[in-house]
């Protein structure tokens, strides 16, 4: 079966569970894996967060849970119709469509949670169920050709902003590529700098502009090119706790998405910088750490994803110097410096480890 058929069957199975309970004279109920913090575990072998084995039960015998079950079934039926017709809807559209249901949502946050409940219950991503986020995927520039339906797209000939990653990235086929690595950067300012300086050619690389915190489609794209095309992934973000976090979500996933991290995380991705050591070694322009930065850095030290010596050293060093720096701070030495000097030195150091 293809992905569409699997999704339809799983969505139907949710209704079958209810019908079977009714037929057997039982109170209808649905088992939903718990997404509470006590059931979210960092798996040292997989190197990302996973869900534990705890489940919750939603029962129509509980008056407080009847509406939640109804919302879940209405949403599942809506998704089944979307997938069957090969259509998609945004999470915002789902919220407004529910206005016509007998069990509508109080706000979009409530509808988003039900979408996540479907994900974790069925073991499929919301994108596979036809539900799309509002945010754009990353921009990609480099020698990669993809096929979306019957359309082939060359990421070198898609304009200066490159190919925009589709929300339905699992339906995209990688046709051809002539690159040796992926360089993902946090800001679009740095993305355009690397494109202008032809970093894609100099480093035989796909340049990925993350646009801040990487969207799910972006993380899925990065994982796919890493695993399917065997391309090493390098991440270059701002040198602050937020840049560290953006990189780590790509590498080891997030606790919130523990149920789908196996499809989104790229544990072998490497963080190039900007590190606290870079701030010192390259004498970069800096800003002082704010109180919120210090608090966040101390939180990262307690996070199991940052247990490695590299991360501990860099986080502690940043706390010691009390400074942070942006990617664009390399412009102190000229616009070309980041491509001519910084990236070659960092790539050589990381690739020779």
Curated annotation (Swiss-Prot):
It catalyses: ATP-dependent breakage, passage and rejoining of double-stranded DNA. Its EC number is 5.6.2.2. Homodimer. Heterotetramer of two Top6A and two Top6B chains. The active site is at 96 (o-(5'-phospho-dna)-tyrosine intermediate). NCBIfam families: PRK04342.1-3. One of its GO terms (molecular function) is DNA binding. Relaxes both positive and negative superturns and exhibits a strong decatenase activity. Residues 2-138 form the Topo IIA-type catalytic domain. Gene3D superfamilies: 3.40.1360.10, Winged helix-like DNA-binding domain superfamily/Winged helix DNA-binding domain. Keywords: ATP-binding, DNA-binding, Isomerase, Magnesium, Metal-binding, Nucleotide-binding, Topoisomerase. Mg(2+) binds at residues 186, 238. GO terms for cellular component: chromosome. CDD domains: TOPRIM_TopoIIB_SPO. It holds the Pfam family TP6A_N. This is Type 2 DNA topoisomerase 6 subunit A. GO terms for biological process: DNA topological change. Its cofactor is Mg(2+). Coiled coil: none annotated.
